[in-house]
Amino acid sequence: MPKSEIHPTWFSNAPVLSEGKTLCSIGSTKPQLQVDVWLGNHPFYTNSQTLVDSEGRVDRFMKKYGLQTKDN
């Protein structure tokens, strides 16, 4: 028999919210869950991700130390 009044309250239909919209309902110890990033607004999944070009850093290093690349 479990001890009484030591277990958290269980909410079986706690809504998961993002930007004011309900995404889904799950079981939780909190009555409502708020998420900032999810599948619908993450840059990787929405194809709005930008790539960082680091080629300039290598060129600056080679120039700074007077090294020749294979192309030169």
Swiss-Prot record:
One of its GO terms (molecular function) is rRNA binding. It is found in: Plastid, Chloroplast. One of its GO terms (cellular component) is ribosome. The keyword rRNA-binding applies. The keyword RNA-binding applies. Binds the 23S rRNA. Part of the 50S ribosomal subunit. Belongs to the bacterial ribosomal protein bL31 family. Type A subfamily. This is Large ribosomal subunit protein bL31c. The gene is rpl31.
